[in-house]
Structure formats: C-alpha cells, structure tokens
C-alpha cells in the first residue's frame, strides 16, 4: 500500500471511530429509543382515541399523552403507583428493556478505550501493536453493541407475541432516532476496527520487508583488521572505503587465488677465494 493510501485509511478509521463514539454516547444518554402508543377503537366510526403515548430510552420513560403528559420517570418506577394509564404490555416491555441496558454501556467503554489507543498509535506510528489492540477493542465494542440491540428487539417482539389481542384496543410501537444512532454506531465501529487491524497488518508487513536479513551482514574478519565492523553490511563496506583500498584488496584477492607457480631458484654462494 502506498503512503498516501495508508494515510487516507488512517484518517478514515479515525473519523469512523469519532463518529461511532459520538453517536453511541448520544444514543445511550437520550430517551428516544422506542415510541409506544395505546388507545381504544371507537365502534361508532372505527376511529381511534389515544389513551397513552410515551417515548423511552435505556434509563427513562417520558409521557406524550394522557394524564401524565410531560412527565418523565425512571424505568424502575415507570409511573406513580395510583396511576392506571399504562397497560400490562407497556409495563412488561419497559421492564424487559432493562436486560439489554448493560451491553451498550460495555460497548461505549470498549469504544472509548479503543479510541484512546488508536490516537496514541497515530501519534507514535512506530508502535504498530497499538493499531492492532485498538482494532480489537473496536470489534469487541461492536459485538457488545449488536448483542444489546438484538436483546432490545427480541424483548419487544416477545412481548408483542405474548400479548392478548383485543378488538377494542390497539397497541403500536416504533423505534426512535436514538436506536438508529446506536445501529449506525455499530457499523462505524466495526468498520474502524477492521481498518485498524488492516493497517497493523500492512505496517507489520512493511517492517519485515525493509528489515535486512541477518545473513546479509559481514562478520568481523579479525580483531586487528581494517575491516573493523563486526556486522558491516557489504554495500556500506564498499561505499565506505577509498578507491586505493579497494584496489589493494583486489590485488590481495588475486594473489591469494592465483599463487606464483615459479619461484626464484636458490643459488649456491660463490666464494671469492682463489682456493
């Protein structure tokens, strides 16, 4: 991968991580995951009359119609004890939603840790392991979030299937924008995790590619030799020596490969004495 492509992928993963973290934070802190509406069907003209309407999040429920209009309560205390404005189906749905609450919180924690590690990895590119660890945290965050979303949906669907249907009443529900933010956050988080792991693999491969093999290094020839580098690369060794040294080395190598075949004969010493 080229340097430009790697930088673009790094920037894209950072943007996805920021958007995913922001959307999930908004989704967890707001009360627009689910809209519920209860009413009766008037037999005269088959019109409907809304008896209760509310929107709920992971922590609170706020009424939009009925005697409690404009008031919000926590999920544990859906409404005052003397109020009978909600049916058993609504109460059961709001109670079952609590089983899915821990998973978005765990997902938010994992996403925050992955975001911090990812930024540190971008600031210090030589620490390639941080990209891998942040990618793992992003993937775990996405898995935790999708488990929470599945539990949230299944809790509502189970209650709808077990609910006793009545021809005189109706019960409608729809998912709100907080739920949509959480779903989009899952897609962004998983994408950021996959890109972080991919960047780690590319950086690790590039490091292995440009790391010289130990066999390419030249060992020390002798302790008192001019070739004093114990692990000197051959190319650097050639570039670091002067032309005269290189020619001397070539002549020495030629003499060692082609020894002299003829030797100077030994002459007997001639005496100058007349005897």
Swiss-Prot record:
Regulates the gating properties of AMPA-selective glutamate receptors (AMPARs). Modulates their gating properties by accelerating their rates of activation, deactivation and desensitization. Displays subunit-specific AMPA receptor regulation. Shows specificity for GRIA1, GRIA4 and the long isoform of GRIA2. According to PubMed:18817736, shows only specificity for GRIA2 and specifically to the form of GRIA2 for which a single amino acid in the pore region has been edited from a glutamine to an arginine residue. Thought to stabilize the calcium channel in an inactivated (closed) state. Gene3D superfamilies: 1.20.140.150. Belongs to the PMP-22/EMP/MP20 family. CACNG subfamily. GO terms for biological process: positive regulation of synaptic transmission, glutamatergic; postsynaptic neurotransmitter receptor diffusion trapping; regulation of AMPA receptor activity; transmission of nerve impulse. It comes from Rattus norvegicus (Rat). It is found in: Membrane; Postsynaptic density membrane. The L-type calcium channel is composed of five subunits: alpha-1, alpha-2/delta, beta and gamma. Acts as an auxiliary subunit for AMPA-selective glutamate receptors (AMPARs). Found in a complex with GRIA1, GRIA2, GRIA3, GRIA4, CNIH2, CNIH3, CACNG2, CACNG3, CACNG4, CACNG7 and CACNG8. Interacts with GRIA1, GRIA2, GRIA3 and GRIA4. The lineage of its organism: Eukaryota, Metazoa, Chordata, Craniata, Vertebrata. PANTHER family: VOLTAGE-DEPENDENT CALCIUM CHANNEL GAMMA SUBUNIT, VOLTAGE-DEPENDENT CALCIUM CHANNEL GAMMA-5 SUBUNIT. It comes from the Eukaryota. GO terms for molecular function: channel regulator activity; voltage-gated calcium channel activity. This is Voltage-dependent calcium channel gamma-5 subunit. The chain crosses the membrane at residues 8-28, 103-123, 129-149, 181-201. The gene is Cacng5. One of its GO terms (cellular component) is postsynaptic membrane. It is a multi-pass membrane protein. Keywords: Cell membrane, Membrane, Postsynaptic cell membrane, Synapse, Transmembrane, Transmembrane helix. Its main location: membrane.
């Amino acid at each position: 991968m080229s340097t430009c492509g790697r930088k673009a992928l790094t920037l894209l993963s950072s943007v996805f991580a920021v958007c995913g973290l922001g959307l999930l934070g908004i989704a967890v802190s707001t009360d627009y995951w689910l809209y519920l509406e209860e009413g009766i069907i008037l037999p005269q003209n088959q019109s409907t009359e809304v008896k209760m309407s509310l929107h709920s999040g992971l922590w609170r429920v706020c009424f939009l119609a009925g005697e409690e209009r404009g008031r919000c309560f926590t999920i544990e205390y859906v409404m005052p004890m003397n109020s009978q404005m909600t049916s058993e189906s609504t109460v059961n749905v709001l109670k079952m939603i609590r089983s899915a609450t821990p998973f978005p919180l765990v997902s938010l924690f994992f996403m925050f840790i992955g975001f911090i590690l990812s930024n540190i990895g971008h600031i210090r590119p030589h620490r390639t392991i941080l990209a891998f660890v942040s990618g793992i945290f992003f993937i775990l965050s996405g898995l935790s979030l999708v488990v929470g979303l599945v539990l949230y949906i299944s809790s509502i669907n189970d209650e709808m299937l077990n609910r006793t249907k009545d021809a005189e009443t109706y019960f409608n529900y729809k998912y709100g924008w907080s739920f949509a933010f959480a779903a989009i956050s899952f897609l962004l988080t998983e994408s950021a995790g996959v890109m972080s792991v991919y960047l780690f693999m590319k950086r690790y491969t590039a490091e292995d590619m440009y790391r010289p093999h130990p066999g390419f290094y030249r060992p020390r020839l002798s302790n008192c030799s001019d070739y004093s580098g114990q692990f000197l690369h051959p190319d650097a060794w050639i570039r670091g020596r002067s032309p005269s040294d290189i020619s001397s080395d070539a002549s020495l190598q030629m003499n060692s490969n082609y020894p002299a075949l003829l030797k100077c004969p030994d002459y007997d010493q001639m005496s100058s004495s007349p005897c």
